[in-house]
Amino acid sequence: MGAYAPAAGVSARGCLDAAGPWTISRALRPPLPPLCFFLLLLLAAPCARAGGYETCPTVQPNILNVHLVPHTHDDVGWLKTVDQYFYGIKNDIQHAGVQYILDSVISALLADPTRRFIYVEIAFFSRWWHQQTNAMREVVRDLVRQGRLEFANGGWVMNDEAATHYGAIVDQMTLGLRFLEDTFGSDGRPRVAWHIDPFGHSREQASLFAQMGFDGFFFGRLDYQDKRVRMQKLEMEQVWRASASLKPPTADLFTGVLPNGYNPPMNLCWDVLCVDQPVVEDPRSPEYNAKELVDYFLNVATAQGRHYRTNHIVMTMGSDFQYENANMWFKNLDKLIRLVNAQQAKGSSVHVLYSTPACYLWELNKANLTWSVKHDDFFPYADGPHQFWTGYFSSRPALKRYERLSYNFLQVCNQLEALVGLAANVGPYGSGDSAPLNKAMAVLQHHDAVSGTSRQHVADDYARQLAAGWVSCEVLLSNALARLRGFKDHLTFCRQLNISICPLSQTAARFQVIVYNPLGRKVNWMVRLPVSEGVFVVKDPNGRTVPSDVVIYPSSDSQAHPPELLFSASLPALGFSTYSVAQVPRWKPQARAPQPIPRRSWSPALTIENEHIRATFDPDTGLLMEIMNMNQRLLLPVRQTFFWYNASIGDNESDQASGAYIFRPNQQKPLPVSRWAQIRLVKTPLVQEVHQNFSAWCSQVVRLYPGRRHLELEWSVGPIPVGDTWGKEVISRFDTPLETKGRFYTDSNGREILERRRDYRPTWKLNQTEPVAGNYYPVNTRIYITDGKMQLTVLTDRSQGGSSLRDGSLELMVHRRLLKDDERGVSEPLMENGSGAWVRGRHLVLLDTAQAAAAGHRLLAEQEVLAPQVVLAPGGGAAYNLGAPPRTQFSGLRRELPPSVHLLTLASWGPEMLLLRLEHQFAVGEDSGRNLSAPVTLNLRDLFSTFTITRLQETTLVANQLREAASRLKWTTNTGPTPHQTPYQLDPANITLEPMEIRTFLASVQWKEVDG
């Protein structure tokens, strides 16, 4: 988005040529034979990396070198859809056509061998590449080989850092970098991460970049106060130590702040979209301005150089969708470079050159300085005193949930494709493919997609892409399940279970429920299906009857809630169980509809409880009043209810309004949606629920299942009323007496936990001008408060903004509807199709000791992100996979993974090749009671049941370099020398994972015959 505050070896090529042109493939499937792919990785040794830097231009010693970086920033959707941007459609909205930019840039690079250009968004570049002739592809390969066309970052998109989950970040980066590796070999491998537009930067993002093999990271947006301090202290560039668990330098990443965001210096923009004056060097012309521009440039360069530590500085020469007429840019830059460098003969100490981020980084590394170290992150981001970009943490909550559900579904799709092999892609249901959903999910990670900061029609298009990806994966799942089950049924994927709609379960007297568990450990999962009224019998995979309930729910004013069938499914690791459901001919409700509980001051307190938890509700208000952990004998008063902030439309202090990006409430104290809730109670052997109705547009169900150690709070909000002309930003708030000393804790992209302190920044003295918005942080999976003894943790089902604005309090923003744009470029208020959106979601609440809490929230968050997938079938289908007995239960693992180990990725990579990632999901010292923070060792040789691993190669996180061949630039820090890394060894029978470590493997496999 463009609103920025002013302020190859021959052998490798042979493999590529043998494979033919790169084609769109399924599930990261390469066009290269495995042997060629491994050869490419082996050729990518440290010498190849040095060779990449050796293509950098010559610099001048002892004077200021100004590295001009021509670039374009091409949003993968924002004001226009992805296709509209690529083809240049709807230029009345925004003049932008990516295909013309790339055409023009290649032509301009060929005109002068000194010119350089960087490109970032592989979602666009790959599409352009597929439209080129073989001759043009060779031209581009030559430019890449020469280092004149350089890829920075290399992900499918430039992902957001606040609303993204680390698994989806890794997937989208893998997709983009895989394309570059397949297409250009090591020549096209980016050496620098480049996040010039995301609105704040997470520590986990930097850790992931380091583990991907990047040498450095440059970004554009930095809090205005932080930037001022850094410029004064000469800390615009430093080393980011991005993990408290991984041993340095594993997660160390050299990080630089760009001086002008990602724009050119003022008055030096020579794009067709700009109005700055071109360089006129003919002194006879009345428009002659060369001397003035040269003097101006020298002053700008000298001033910038005062804030950086070496005799090298960088200037970004480009911006949003620029270089559609690249000649206009390059012609003026050619003149500027020649004229400025000519001044050296007159004593100037400034040298200007075409460069790239990697070449600039190379010079910084050669300076051999000692750099300061950063340990925290760059949230929240503000570009002015009342302009905190913390609203987008919660914008478009329905899209955020759809993205998270799609990540869940994609992993199920990838796993079954890997477990079954080609039979999942071509089978009785047709051609199944994981690639469309993989690419759609990659697009959704863009910093104007999952962030909720695009225009409405673009958000609709993002959802369309996800839906199309689901269809293709559903075919794949159907083929895989037919192969594994031995049945060909008409499978039904009930996509609207969140609103209790599933036609098959609501109409059929008999049906089957297949529940697939994507986790590497057994799970007990409560299945909830809408049904007709009656009595149902549920049988497990062995034909034994299991307890079940039909719960009849109260009807709200707006819609009827169908009865729901509940039963607990026992699911094997990385596998499925099949349950059969039959309606009993006689009608007898298993639970009567709950009646409203009147509010009387003398009424006893209402409780729901199981063997682990008791939740107590105030009889006068209907609000949650108290939670008790009965195992630990912990009792905590907890008052939970909903409030809303009145969104600012500007005031006397500032005309800044709340919008898609900005959160700015009119006052610090939010208003209650209601001071009490009408409540209804549901109690059956399988579930206890308190239904709370706060208003016509806000309700909640507090739910407790047998055996569970957490409360489930299922909230429903919307459409938010704005008839009073007040925009509203709705929060769920938990108030407790815990003495938290201004501290609370949030996750970073779903992985490590960061401490937050109210009205505080770790690296500068904060002038807090927005006490609410300035204390909001992104919450991807969890937030908690603790007094050191007790800990209250709330897990989310999507990314949200959250905070603790007073001791003992915790809040999460669940929905927003705004009447005014925040003037950051969208030019559209966040109204969600005008009528507003109704959104449903879940918060999972845990109360435990501070010492034991991590074991609970880590494993629960894993299960929330990768929840079981429910598929229905009418039953009685034809036999499939003749020769093998029918199967009602299956596990893809021969043994469960330990609880501290998460199977992050199992996906098809190529013919007889799989991509495997294993992760230690606990941090150092996080759990001592069960020793879950200790290193853990696995044997991969016979771990999987459907295939045998014949060869195992360990790679970097994104699988574009062999780990043994990968090397990164080394940096000296003021914290002293980093430990010497132990020599690399790989033994498939002894794979050890250290806390927070992710290990990535390419496995050559042979699939086994699927039998009983």
From Swiss-Prot:
<feature type="glycosylation site" description="N-linked (GlcNAc...) asparagine">
    <location>
        <position position="693"/>
    </location>
</feature>
<dbReference type="GO" id="GO:0006013">
    <property type="term" value="P:mannose metabolic process"/>
</dbReference>
<keyword id="KW-0732">Signal</keyword>
<protein>
    <recommendedName>
        <fullName>Lysosomal alpha-mannosidase</fullName>
        <ecNumber>3.2.1.24</ecNumber>
    </recommendedName>
</protein>
<feature type="active site" description="Nucleophile">
    <location>
        <position position="197"/>
    </location>
</feature>
<feature type="binding site">
    <location>
        <position position="73"/>
    </location>
    <ligand>
        <name>Zn(2+)</name>
    </ligand>
</feature>
<feature type="disulfide bond">
    <location>
        <begin position="494"/>
        <end position="502"/>
    </location>
</feature>
<keyword id="KW-1015">Disulfide bond</keyword>
<keyword id="KW-0326">Glycosidase</keyword>
<feature type="disulfide bond">
    <location>
        <begin position="413"/>
        <end position="473"/>
    </location>
</feature>
<keyword id="KW-0378">Hydrolase</keyword>
<dbReference type="Pfam" id="PF07748">
    <property type="entry name" value="Glyco_hydro_38C"/>
</dbReference>
<keyword id="KW-0458">Lysosome</keyword>
<feature type="glycosylation site" description="N-linked (GlcNAc...) asparagine">
    <location>
        <position position="931"/>
    </location>
</feature>
<keyword id="KW-0479">Metal-binding</keyword>
<dbReference type="Pfam" id="PF09261">
    <property type="entry name" value="Alpha-mann_mid"/>
</dbReference>
<dbReference type="GO" id="GO:0005764">
    <property type="term" value="C:lysosome"/>
</dbReference>
<feature type="disulfide bond">
    <location>
        <begin position="56"/>
        <end position="359"/>
    </location>
</feature>
<feature type="glycosylation site" description="N-linked (GlcNAc...) asparagine">
    <location>
        <position position="833"/>
    </location>
</feature>
<comment type="function">
    <text>Necessary for the catabolism of N-linked carbohydrates released during glycoprotein turnover.</text>
</comment>
<feature type="signal peptide">
    <location>
        <begin position="1"/>
        <end position="50"/>
    </location>
</feature>
<feature type="glycosylation site" description="N-linked (GlcNAc...) asparagine">
    <location>
        <position position="498"/>
    </location>
</feature>
<dbReference type="InterPro" id="IPR011330">
    <property type="entry name" value="Glyco_hydro/deAcase_b/a-brl"/>
</dbReference>
<feature type="glycosylation site" description="N-linked (GlcNAc...) asparagine">
    <location>
        <position position="368"/>
    </location>
</feature>
<dbReference type="Pfam" id="PF21260">
    <property type="entry name" value="Laman-like_dom"/>
</dbReference>
<dbReference type="InterPro" id="IPR015341">
    <property type="entry name" value="Glyco_hydro_38_cen"/>
</dbReference>
<comment type="similarity">
    <text>Belongs to the glycosyl hydrolase 38 family.</text>
</comment>
<dbReference type="InterPro" id="IPR011682">
    <property type="entry name" value="Glyco_hydro_38_C"/>
</dbReference>
<dbReference type="InterPro" id="IPR027291">
    <property type="entry name" value="Glyco_hydro_38_N_sf"/>
</dbReference>
<feature type="glycosylation site" description="N-linked (GlcNAc...) asparagine">
    <location>
        <position position="646"/>
    </location>
</feature>
<dbReference type="Pfam" id="PF01074">
    <property type="entry name" value="Glyco_hydro_38N"/>
</dbReference>
<feature type="disulfide bond">
    <location>
        <begin position="269"/>
        <end position="274"/>
    </location>
</feature>
<dbReference type="GO" id="GO:0004559">
    <property type="term" value="F:alpha-mannosidase activity"/>
</dbReference>
<feature type="binding site">
    <location>
        <position position="197"/>
    </location>
    <ligand>
        <name>Zn(2+)</name>
    </ligand>
</feature>
<feature type="binding site">
    <location>
        <position position="447"/>
    </location>
    <ligand>
        <name>Zn(2+)</name>
    </ligand>
</feature>
<keyword id="KW-0862">Zinc</keyword>
<feature type="glycosylation site" description="N-linked (GlcNAc...) asparagine">
    <location>
        <position position="767"/>
    </location>
</feature>
<dbReference type="InterPro" id="IPR000602">
    <property type="entry name" value="Glyco_hydro_38_N"/>
</dbReference>
<dbReference type="InterPro" id="IPR028995">
    <property type="entry name" value="Glyco_hydro_57/38_cen_sf"/>
</dbReference>
<dbReference type="Pfam" id="PF17677">
    <property type="entry name" value="Glyco_hydro38C2"/>
</dbReference>
<feature type="binding site">
    <location>
        <position position="75"/>
    </location>
    <ligand>
        <name>Zn(2+)</name>
    </ligand>
</feature>
<dbReference type="InterPro" id="IPR041147">
    <property type="entry name" value="GH38_C"/>
</dbReference>
